[in-house]
Amino acid sequence: MSVKEWPVSERPREKLQTQGAEYLSDAELLAILLGSGSGGQDVVSFARRLLSDFGGVGALLTATPEQLLACNGIGPARVNQLRVVLELSRRYLKWQLERSDGFTEPTMVKDYLTSQLRHQGREVFAILLLDSQHRLLRYEELFQGTINAAPVYPREVIKLVMQYNAAAVILAHNHPSGVAEPSQADQRVTERVKKALTLIDVALLDHFVVGAGDPISFAERGLL
């Protein structure tokens, strides 16, 4: 039975209009975005299957185009729809960080870094440059390496800090393996960058490692 044959009160679009987006399930919201089902499934069932196959909204939105195209019912147009949603969410999180005291809201920082780094297929070292009020000046991906290592040079970090006159820094990198636990190499790199920043009186506020779960904070672990 198609969604159009459902009781009006159960249809996602009508629920959105009468109750608000916050009352819709992930599958119902995704169904509105997709517009139609696939392979005989109504759009809500199709959306539920996608979420189940990928393991949730975050994994679906950060999946690669190749992973998405491997699913029955997803073609280039739907891949582009999902990519647009992810990019809009990234820009919204960046907008929030630019207008708020972002470091006092670590969840927001973690969400932003997850959206930027979790989908990367190789290791990436990134930096958040902050002003004296800890508001975001710029996000920059400095180095990309193999899946096992990304070379980090403190002088490149310093160069970028000086270019944007940053007062504080947050470091971040991803572990494509999915295991976010900081390695000894991660800790050594963090210490090297911290010492270099100290010479120019710039604070290193945190270093996040992004994996499959919640990003790991060096500050929360007492590793800074």
UniProtKB/Swiss-Prot annotation:
Pfam families, per database record: RadC, UPF0758_N
Biological processes, Gene Ontology terms: proteolysis
All copies of domain MPN, residue ranges: 102-224
Residues involved in Zn(2+) binding: 173, 175, 186
Segment forming the signal sequence: none
UniProt GO molecular function: metal ion binding; metallopeptidase activity
PROSITE patterns: MPN, UPF0758
Keyword terms, alphabetized: Hydrolase, Metal-binding, Metalloprotease, Protease, Zinc
Record carries keyword Isomerase: no
Highest taxon in the source lineage: Bacteria
InterPro entries: MPN, RadC_JAB, RuvA_2-like, UPF0758, UPF0758_CS, UPF0758_N
CDD domains for this protein: MPN_DUF2466
Intervals of motif JAMM motif: 173-186
PANTHER family membership: DNA REPAIR PROTEIN RADC (PTHR30471), UPF0758 PROTEIN YEES-RELATED (PTHR30471:SF3)
Protein family: Belongs to the UPF0758 family.
Name of the protein: UPF0758 protein IL0240
The organism of origin for this protein: Idiomarina loihiensis (strain ATCC BAA-735 / DSM 15497 / L2-TR)
